[in-house]
Structure formats: structure tokens, C-alpha cells
Amino acid sequence: MPIITLPDGAQRTYSTPVTIAEIAAEIGPGLAKAAIAGEVNGELVDTCIPISVNANINIITSKNKEGIDIIRHSFAHLLGHAIKQLYPDAKMAIGPVIENGFYYDIAYKDTFSLDDLNQIELRIKELIKQDYDVVVEEVSKEKARKTFLDRDEAYKVQIIDEIPDNETIKLYKHQEYIDMCRGPHVPNTKHLRAFSLMKVSGAYWRGDSNNEMLQRIYGTAWGSTKELEAYLLKIEEAEKRDHRKIGKKLDLFHTQEEAPGMIFWHPKGWSIYQVLESFIRETLILNDYKEIKTPQTVDRSLWEKSGHWDKFKEDMFTTTSENREYAIKPMNCPCHIQVFNEGLKSYRDLPIRLAEFGSCHRNEPSGALHGLMRVRNFVQDDAHIFCTEAQIQDEVSKFIDLVFDVYKAFGFESIIIKLSTRPTKRVGSDEIWDKSEKALADALNIKKFEWSYLPGEGAFYGPKIEFSLKDCIDRVWQCGTIQVDFSMPHRLGASYIDENSQKKVPVMLHRAILGSFERFIGILIEEYEGKFPPWLSPIQVIVIGITDRNSIKCKEISNLLMLRGYRATYDTRNEKVGLKIREHTLQRIPYLLIIGDKEQEEGTVSVRTMHGIDMGSMKLTEFQEIINEAISLKGNYKPVPKR
């Protein structure tokens, strides 16, 4: 007689095994209609699975996160059902849940087009309307293998062959279509309503470029039409802000096939990069960091000593010279230890903070490259702090202040903080890990920040704190980190003399604020939609003449502004002034100074902003006060009418 305990503590006793569907029906018709799965003693199960033991249960609906994932997984199977009806020769591979949706990898002789996606989506909608039950059957490995062998589903057979012989396999049946999965899935297609197929792309079977290329159809699915529409609106907004499109439109950068994953910075894009670098450099100087520069290529022996050769060899670019093998550095830390190792260090010298705008190369798969966001060559705002164990908390605390100051300068207010703790495989004693994790947690708690743990997600050499930005359309970008390292200083022979004249190994803190310049600029392009605040804008001011008579004055004012440190230019083309204003507004130039005969005679400029605000006529000195204030606000600048 199973005793069932509900989330509110209420208990129900049954004389025979009972299912989630039956329990939900007893509680009420509304819950019975909404139930899509159950959680039994912490394990997710289908609504039809009998419960024969005492259990704590939770009934899962589309309002639960688990429920949304179940809906998405069920949609993947429904996609498979529709594909096999429309394209019987297609072979189904895998169809997992991903963030905000699902995908299915499919082998098919023809390339799926957008028209094909529309037809598949229509067939899915037709199947949903049939409100059929999804039937689950648990079978032996042998029966599952025969089922898919009979259906000529070679990819499913490959997966089954890797499952231990004594395991059972769940088959989920959508009418004539059969798929396999751990489950659970929705009990009926009536729970599958809000979805959209998004795109199709190529994907290698099992992610291995030596295997055949499959076609991956992506979809999104939600618990309600309202949630789906909100997500599609967010996707539309993200596409509008795509840094690759804006970068091309504003002539900031480009990539090309001859240098995959490498950025060609154009003058305006490089201007943004230089402003960013100068800002970070000034900030580091004020926080007692010493800037260094280390080599791009280093003999493989150093990477073997540091441990990178064993773990990252496949991701490293290498070259040879005079029978020696070199790696183009994928990270800066081993080289920073070489700088620390030059000369004897005392405990009185610590902490030592070494910073570098280090150019790194990593051999990312070509299919993963994405504009500025995922590249093969990138520059990190990298630094390493060499300190004692006792100094960890204080150094972390100072770095947290630094991170928040920098992010605030760009206008980011919502910061998500996570602390990654010790993994199963690690170096260092439990005592050192205890101290380090406590030091990081205490540093966060003293600041009274909200944060959460990522258990087991730390590196093998130490725990870390991750700082992620939430942008204006609620996307999360992981940028800053500070990570404790007990291993590498020891491996590479770093040491200092302590107060007892004994040689000791320093702790090394890896830290970055932006992560990489390329990716952070990509984030900024999308955050600002190319409408950079004046301090970052490649061109801060353009002086526009109304007629040829104003050309000389335009050039004079532009040159004067440049001499005073502003990024200024002029437009004296023989075009209508309205056309010129429109063009430069579309180029997102913050301030447009218009000069006609009246302004030239009065010694004034007429000021407009890229946001369409007419600030009226004023003396150049008055305009300088306005732009100086705007620049001083950095990323917190907001366009306002003339005061």
C-alpha cells in the first residue's frame, strides 16, 4: 500500500499501485488536465508509470521548468513524426533539448529548405490537432535494437549498441512513429501547442568532422502562446541588434575565409577598441597593476610543464623552427609566471599584480565561429595576482569592486555572480580548498551580493567566481572571472621567501574583467544597437555645411575640435543638408553640428543628436560643455534635449 506525500505535506494511502495521472485526477480536474509528468522521490516519471512504494511526489505541469523541458523533448519526437511522414527515407539521429528549444539531427539526401521547414511545421500542427496519446513501452535492449533495425534506423541502432546489455530502453510511440528516450514525455499531443521551427544547419554525426554531415533542424517550444510570442519578439530584437550586421553597416570590422576566426578591424572599429583598451589600462594603473608583454610563440616544453599540452594540445596552433616545436599561446598564464620567476621575491613584495593585453590563439572548430563572439584570435584583458593564502580574500574583494566599477561604466547594472567549487578530480588538499572556497564566499558575502554556487564546476586547480552581464534584452553574457590556482605556480617553479626565510609557492589568481576585447565589443555593439555613447563612439562629432560657402568654416571647426581631443570630421559635399543629416544619423554619430550662413555670421553651431533631438544654436564653447558632460558619463549617458 503506497503512501503518497504531496508537496504541501498531505498524505494519501492507496491499496494498489497508483499513477501520477490518477493522483492528479483525484486532486481535481484542472490538475488532471494540466499534468504532463511527475516527480517521484526526486525522479521524473511519465504520468502513466505505476508507483508501488511510499513516495514524495510533485505533479509537473507546463508552469514548471521541468515541464517546459519535457514539452520541448516531446516536440523533438513530434518533429521526427512529421519528418518521417513527409520524407519516409529520412534517417533520425538524435533530438535533445537545448536552451529555449530543441533540435533533431537528420540524414536525408536533399537539403531542407525554408519551404520544407514550413511544410514540416504545418504537418506538426496537423498532428497536434489529432490529440493522440503518446504511448511509452519499456523493452529489452534486444527488442529495441530489432525495432529500429526493422525500420532501417542505423543511427538509433548505433546508440543502442553502446548501451549495456542488461539495461532496458524506453520506446515512445507517436502513432506509427517510434523513438527512444529516457523520458518522460507528455501523455498526449494536446500539451504541445506553442512552438516554431527556427532554422536548419549542418552538424556532424556525434560532433566528429570525420563522420557524415547531418541536417539539424532547430525549434523552440513553450508552455503558452504568450511565452512563445515573447520569445520570438526577443529573437527579432536580437537579430536587429546582430553585431555582424551593425558592424558591416557602420564599417567597424569584417571577417573573411582566408583568415577564419580572425578580425579585420576597420578604422572606426579600431577606434572603439583603442578607447576600450585605454580605459582598462588607466583603471589597472589606478589599481596597482603592472603591465607586461610576453611572447606569442613559446616552446612546447613550457606548455608540457604547465599541463596545457596534455589538456589543450588539439586546441593549440603550433609551428616549428630549427627542429623545435612551438605553440602560439592560447593563454597568458605560463608566461606571466616566467616574469614572476625573474629575481628573488619576498613575502613583503606580495601581492604582485601582472597585467597584459595578451593576444591569444585557439583552434576553435570552424562551425563554432561567430563574428566577434567566437573567434580564433582574441585579446584578453588578462592579469595574474601572485599572493599568499592569507591575501586571497582581500585580493578577491578588491577585484570584485573593480569588476563592478568597470561594468557600471558601460551601463551594465544587472550582474549575475556564481561561485564554482571543487570538482571530483583536483589538485591540492581539502584544507586548501576549504580555505579558498571560504575566502571567495566571504569576499562575496561581505559585499552583500546575491550569488549562487555551481557545485563541482571549479577547475582542477582551484575554485572560481564568474561574473555574467544581463543585457537590455535579458541575454546573459559570462565575462569576468577570478580563479584560484594552487597548481601552475608549483609546476612552473614559482616561489617567494616567507617571513621565516623559507621558500614557499605563491597562490596565483587568474582574473579578467572583459574576458576578450573582441567578444566584449560584440556585446557592446548589440547592447547599444550601434548607438555608442559619445565616449566610445568612433566619430563623436561631424560638422555639416549647408552650402559651399560654409565649407571652410566646417573644416576649421572640425580641426579645432580634433585639436581639443574630440574624434571629429566634416561633410562639405554638395548635397542637400537633409540627406547629409539622415546619412550621418544612420551612421550613429552622436552629435551633428550644422553650419549655414546664419551660424557662420553669428559664430554659432546648430546642434542635433543621432536620436533626432534638435538642441538649437549655441556657441562652440557651450557645445563643448555638453559633449564633455556626455563623455564623462561614459556608458550611463542618456540623450536629453537642450537644457
Curated annotation (Swiss-Prot):
Residues that hold Zn(2+) according to the record: C333, H384, H510
Keyword Aminoacyl-tRNA synthetase carried by entry: yes
Cofactor entry: Zn(2+)
InterPro entries: aa-tRNA-synt_IIb, aa-tRNA-synth_II, aa-tRNA-synth_II/BPL/LPL, Anticodon-bd, Anticodon-bd_dom_sf, Beta-grasp_dom_sf, TGS, TGS-like
Domain TGS: residue ranges: 1-61
GO cellular component terms given for this protein: cytosol
Region of interest called Catalytic, as start-end residue ranges on this chain: 242-533
Name of this protein: Threonine--tRNA ligase
Organism from which the protein derives: Prochlorococcus marinus (strain SARG / CCMP1375 / SS120)
